[in-house]
Amino acid sequence: MEYTVQWLSDNTRIKELVNFFISHKTTSYISHSEIISGRAVDSKHWNSNLEAILTDQFNNENNTSTQLKILIAENNNHDIIGMLVFHVINSGFRQYAVLEDMLLDQSIRGMSIGSTLLKNAIQESKNWDIHFILLESGVDNEGAHHFFNKYGFEKVSENYILML
C-alpha cells in the first residue's frame, strides 16, 4: 500500500481527524490523559461529547507555551489511515513533547505505517530541539506497550486514579 506522511499544516481537516479518531478508538486506549482532558469519563468509558471535545482540542492554538502538532498518514485517495497527535511543551526548563494519541485504521495494521509515523515524529523532535518524548498508554493496551518499547521508550512510572 502506498501512503504519504505529513504534518497537518492547517485546520481544514480537523473534522476528518475527529471522525477518524472516533472510528478507531477502543477502551483499551483510555489512560489518565484521556480522563484529564475530558475525552473519557473514566478508565472504561469515552465521553458522550467526544466529538466536540476533540474538535476543540485539535483547533486550540491559543497557548504560547505549548504547540499541538498532528502527523497524518493518508492513502492515494487522501483518506486518513493513521494519525499521531504530538504536544510540544516549553516548560521554561527544557522543551519536551507528549505523544498524546496515535491511531491507525485497523485494516492496515502490520504495514509499518505506525512505525513510519513514530520515526518521523522522533526525527522532527530532534530537529525541534526537544529533549525527550513522554507518552502514556492504557493499562490493557499491551500491543502499544510492546510497540513503544521496541523504539526505546522506557516505563518510568505507573499512574493511579480514584474516581470521586
Predicted regions and their residues:
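Conserved GNAT-fold acetyl-CoA-binding loop/helix
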Residues: 25-58
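Conserved GNAT acetyl-CoA-binding A-motif
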Residues: 125-136
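Conserved acetyl-CoA-binding loop-helix of GNAT-fold acetyltransferases
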Residues: 101-104, 110-123, 150
